[in-house]
Amino acid sequence: MEPIVYIYQDHLQDFWNSGQSQCFGAAFEWKGEQVYHVYIKYPQVAPTGYSMPCLFRVVDTDDYGKAEDVALSVYASMPEEAKRVPVVIVCIHVEDTKVSSRAFIVDDGRIIEAVVKYVPRKSELYTRSKGLLEVGALESKKVLIVGLGSGGAPIAVELAKAGVGHFILMDFDRIELHNIARHICGVNELGRLKVNAVKDAILLKNPYAQVETYDIDMNKQLDILEKCVAESDLTIVATDEYASRYNINARLVKLGKVGLFGRAIYYA
């Protein structure tokens, strides 16, 4: 099975525009699956997998044709401590503004070329939804979600999948054991603030989304609640507590804003 390397198109373009000829990045492998995700900029969400060194190198037309030799030469010049694990080397070539790349996995001097696949630019990420959803309109919308249990959390992820570009998340609670059976988060996120865990889930679906988080009890900070309601195009009220629902509703009425109310059974 050929290894596969995933590269962000935006990262490649930004690297080329910077004028650098070489830079170090980070790579993460799904152990045993020969799948590697490589980054020039460290991702917003901590990647899954085992980390390893990664190096990006710009090459001319002649060297691009013999990129394997270039990769071996680059590998030979790397410090010995970097060679204790496999290394991903990406050779980048630009012709007529088109950026192309070849990727190699080098392990103890042995080299194998990988299949390169690209994570698309922001403008292309939701092309399959065009015609079904108004993706362009949703990208500019801001949604406030108060309460990130088994109701609010999946709503946040579904909105991210639909192409909503801006989120405000509000919840003071943490992921607890009793949440796991029905929540989008798993046991590896026990103890995390729900706002941070759900933010990561959003960014895994839409890495270009803008996400603000407030790990507060909004009943005690009503000024922040009112500010967030005022900024948002839609407020999702997914709390299971009467005082918070009353306080949010009062601000929705005061500001003439739209809100959707829903709740799950206790302990969800």
Where on the chain are the PLM-derived regions?
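Hydrophobic/aromatic beta-strand patches that form the interior of the parallel beta-sheet core
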Residues: 88-90, 144, 168-170, 214, ...
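Glycine-rich adenosine-cofactor-binding loop
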Residues: 131-176
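Short amphipathic alpha-helical segments and helix-helix/interface helices
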Residues: 75, 199, 225-226, 248-253
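ADP-ribose/adenylate-binding Rossmann-like module
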Residues: 234-268
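Short amphipathic alpha-helical segments
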Residues: 156-158, 181-182, 247-250
